[in-house]
Curated annotation (Swiss-Prot):
<feature type="binding site">
    <location>
        <position position="95"/>
    </location>
    <ligand>
        <name>S-adenosyl-L-methionine</name>
    </ligand>
</feature>
<feature type="binding site">
    <location>
        <begin position="190"/>
        <end position="193"/>
    </location>
    <ligand>
        <name>substrate</name>
    </ligand>
</feature>
<keyword id="KW-0949">S-adenosyl-L-methionine</keyword>
<dbReference type="Pfam" id="PF02390">
    <property type="entry name" value="Methyltransf_4"/>
</dbReference>
<feature type="binding site">
    <location>
        <position position="117"/>
    </location>
    <ligand>
        <name>S-adenosyl-L-methionine</name>
    </ligand>
</feature>
<feature type="binding site">
    <location>
        <position position="153"/>
    </location>
    <ligand>
        <name>substrate</name>
    </ligand>
</feature>
<dbReference type="InterPro" id="IPR029063">
    <property type="entry name" value="SAM-dependent_MTases_sf"/>
</dbReference>
<comment type="similarity">
    <text>Belongs to the class I-like SAM-binding methyltransferase superfamily. TrmB family.</text>
</comment>
<dbReference type="GO" id="GO:0008176">
    <property type="term" value="F:tRNA (guanine(46)-N7)-methyltransferase activity"/>
</dbReference>
<dbReference type="InterPro" id="IPR003358">
    <property type="entry name" value="tRNA_(Gua-N-7)_MeTrfase_Trmb"/>
</dbReference>
<keyword id="KW-0808">Transferase</keyword>
<comment type="pathway">
    <text>tRNA modification; N(7)-methylguanine-tRNA biosynthesis.</text>
</comment>
<dbReference type="GO" id="GO:0043527">
    <property type="term" value="C:tRNA methyltransferase complex"/>
</dbReference>
<protein>
    <recommendedName>
        <fullName>tRNA (guanine-N(7)-)-methyltransferase</fullName>
        <ecNumber>2.1.1.33</ecNumber>
    </recommendedName>
</protein>
<keyword id="KW-0489">Methyltransferase</keyword>
<feature type="binding site">
    <location>
        <position position="43"/>
    </location>
    <ligand>
        <name>S-adenosyl-L-methionine</name>
    </ligand>
</feature>
<comment type="function">
    <text>Catalyzes the formation of N(7)-methylguanine at position 46 (m7G46) in tRNA.</text>
</comment>
Length: 213
C-alpha cells in the first residue's frame, strides 16, 4: 500500500538536524553525526518509530539510525524522538537498496528488520529485505559476530528467510514461531506488531549472527 504524500512532511523533516539528507558525508565517520563513538544499530524500515524510540530510550549508550523511504512515517518517528528529547537517534529518508553508499565495511553492530514487505510474488522475492542480495550487503557493512534481529507476521517470508540467512552463512542463534508465547524477554513491540498480535496473529522472530569466517 502506497502512502498518500503529505505536503507538510518534507519541510518538517528538513528543518530538524536529526534528519540527514546527505548521509554519504558520514560514510567514513558516523561518530561525527552523533558526537561520540558509541556502537551503531540500524533499523531498516522504521515506520512510525515506536520501536526505535523505545530502543534509544532504554539504551542511551547506543547510536540508532532509522531508515525509511516515506516522509509521512518518518515525520511521526521524528516527533516521537523529539517528544522524548532523545539525542542518540538519527533519521535517514532513503531507499534501503543504497545502504552501501553510506556505510563502510565493519561499521554496524546490529540491524533490525521489523515487518518488512513480504513481496509474496516469486518475481518480486529479490525485493525482500532478507533476500540474499540484501544479506550479502549487510554482512559486509556489519562487524563480525554482530546480529540481525528479524520479525514478521508472514509465515512464508519467515520460512524463506531462514533459508536465505543459512545460504549467506549467518549463524542462527534464536528462532521462534510465536514470539509472544516464547521465553524471549528482550522484545520491543512495533505498532504493526501490536495490531497483528491483537488479531491473534503469531509473530515470527529470529536472531542471526554474522559469520565472516
Amino acid at each position: 500500500m502506497r502512502l498518500r504524500r503529505k505536503a507538510w512532511a518534507r519541510p518538517e523533516l528538513e528543518s530538524d538536524p536529526k534528519v540527514i539528507y546527505n548521509p554519504m558525508q558520514y560514510k567514513e565517520n558516523w561518530q561525527e553525526a552523533f558526537g561520540n563513538n558509541h556502537p551503531i544499530h540500524l533499523e531498516l524500515g522504521c515506520g512510525r518509530g515506536q520501536f526505535i524510540n523505545q530502543c534509544a530510550e532504554l539504551n542511551p549508550h547506543i547510536n540508532y539510525i532509522a531508515i525509511d523511504l516515506y516522509d509521512e512515517v518518518l515525520v511521526k518517528a521524528l516527533r516521537k524522538i523529539n517528544e522524548k528529547a532523545l539525542h542518540n537517534v538519527r533519521v535517514i529518508p532513503m531507499n534501503i537498496a543504497k545502504l552501501e553508499s553510506i556505510f563502510k565495511h565493519d561499521q554496524i553492530e546490529k540491524i533490525y528488520i521489523n515487518f518488512c514487505n513480504p513481496w509474496p510474488s516469486r518475481r518480486h522475492h529479490h525485493k525482500r529485505l532478507t533476500h540474499p542480495q540484501f544479506l550479502s550487503v549487510y554482512k559486509k557493512l556489519m562487524k563480525d559476530h554482530s546480529e540481525i534481529w528479524f520479525k514478521t507476521d508472514d509465515d512464508e517470508l519467515f520460512k524463506d528467510s531462514l533459508r536465505y540467512f543459512a545460504e549467506e552463512g549467518f549463524i542462527e542463534k534464536y528462532r521462534t514461531f510465536d514470539l509472544h508465547q516464547s521465553e524471549f524477554t528482550e522484545n520491543i513491540k512495533t505498532e504493526y506488531e501490536e495490531k497483528f498480535s491483537n488479531q491473534g496473529v503469531k509473530i515470527k522472530f529470529g536472531i542471526f549472527e554474522v559469520n565472516k569466517g
